[in-house]
Structures are given as structure tokens and as C-alpha cells.
């Protein structure tokens, strides 16, 4: 049974039995710094997952999947093993935790052991649950990844689908960006 969403109550009871990642990321121009916010307060035992740093540095597009080797190194540095239950949360309007959840699935982490905190840090704080400034020092692990390349489609496959209609494509941008009424805040995508 996949538990892709876990409640704040569940996480509070299981904090000592999961690996926790704060994957907060903010759109450019918001004047918010996710790492500074993490240093001020985060859920106990959380490590900060930097979406900018932990994405492909070789692509001209932002936030592309990292290489298998880079993913293994990053996740090993967090002390996460292949058998750990990983819970990801964020404190951003773009729900960046879902992107990191997808990365774990792409690199074949057991789908039963990768979850997103329902409501994120916002809900955790609204419920007056405990936060800390203490930095979690993880012991390095030896995480092994295997790419599930079927989870990524290229431009040709997308274009072919316009004719074949074999799958539904969902654009997750907000309505203003979707209709071109608001500029793309990431200059690499203009």
C-alpha cells in the first residue's frame, strides 16, 4: 500500500523512524531564501534538500533530473538508505516537495517508502507542532539508484502524442503563466 501523503499527526509520531527532507524552493522574484528559512526553523531531524544544487548542472533548463551518480552521492550524503522511509515537505507555494518525491520515484526508491507531508510546513506550524534550528548531521550511507527512464518523455514523444492521444499531459503552471498573461519567472524558460 502506497502512503504517498502522510499527515502531520502521523509524522509527529514517526519522526524517529523516517528520513526527513525539507525541499522548500521559491520562485525567483519572491525575495525569499529557502535555506535561510530552513536555518530559522524546520521539523526535527530534517535535512535541507537544495533543488537548485541537486538538479542537473549540465542542462540549460532549470531543475532537470541529476545524473544517477550525482543522485546517489546526494542521497548518500543525507544518510538515506534504499530501505528508508523518506518523508519530504516544503514551505513554498510551488509544492517543490512533490518534485523531489518524483525524483525518488525516478531513481527507483520503493514507492511504499517515499511520502510527502500533507499540508507541508505551513500546516505543521498552524497546528503549533514543534520546530527546531538544530542541524541534523547525517552519517553517510551507500545509496544505490536505478533510473526509471520511462518516467521521462522527450519533445518528439510529446509532439507524437498530439496525434496519437495515448496519454494525458498536464501543465502544472498557474493560469496566468499558462495563458501567457504573466511572464515566466525563470529566465531560462523564456
Which stretches of residues belong to each language-model region?
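Flexible, polar/low-complexity N-terminal or interdomain linker segments that lie immediately upstream
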Residues: 1-36, 44, 121-189
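A structural signal for short, well-ordered beta-strand segments and their strand-loop junctions
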Residues: 20-22, 48, 87-88, 113-118, ...
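Acidic/polar N-terminal loop/beta-strand segments that form early-domain functional surfaces
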Residues: 23-26, 49-54, 91
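Short active-site-adjacent helix-start/loop capping segments
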Residues: 28-31, 55-58, 94-98
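Poly-acidic low-complexity segments
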Residues: 32-33, 50, 110
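A general structural signal for stabilizing positions within well-ordered secondary structure
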Residues: 37-40, 106
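Aromatic- and Gly/Pro-rich amphipathic surface segment
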Residues: 39-43, 47-78
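Thiolate-centered catalytic microenvironments shared by cysteine-dependent enzyme domains
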Residues: 62-156, 160-161, 181-182
Amino acid at each position: 500500500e502506497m502512503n504517498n501523503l502522510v499527515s502531520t499527526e502521523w509524522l509527529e509520531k514517526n519522526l524517529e523512524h523516517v528520513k526527513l527532507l525539507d525541499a522548500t524552493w521559491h520562485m525567483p522574484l519572491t525575495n525569499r531564501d529557502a535555506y535561510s528559512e530552513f536555518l530559522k526553523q524546520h521539523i526535527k531531524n530534517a535535512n535541507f534538500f537544495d533543488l537548485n544544487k541537486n538538479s542537473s548542472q549540465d542542462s540549460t533548463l532549470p531543475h532537470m533530473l541529476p545524473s544517477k551518480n550525482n543522485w546517489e552521492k546526494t542521497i548518500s550524503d543525507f544518510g538515506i538508505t534504499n530501505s528508508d522511509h523518506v518523508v519530504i515537505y516544503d514551505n513554498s507555494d510551488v509544492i517543490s516537495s512533490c518534485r523531489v518525491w518524483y525524483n525518488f520515484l525516478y531513481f527507483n526508491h520503493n514507492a511504499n517508502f517515499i511520502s510527502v507531508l500533507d499540508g507541508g510546513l505551513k500546516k505543521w506550524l498552524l497546528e503549533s507542532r514543534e520546530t527546531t534550528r538544530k542541524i541534523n548531521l547525517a552519517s553517510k550511507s551507500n545509496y544505490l539508484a536505478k533510473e526509471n527512464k520511462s518516467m521521462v518523455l522527450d519533445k518528439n514523444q510529446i509532439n507524437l502524442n498530439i496525434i496519437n492521444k495515448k496519454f494525458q499531459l498536464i501543465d502544472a503552471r498557474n493560469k496566468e503563466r499558462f495563458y501567457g498573461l504573466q511572464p515566466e519567472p525563470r529566465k531560462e524558460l523564456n
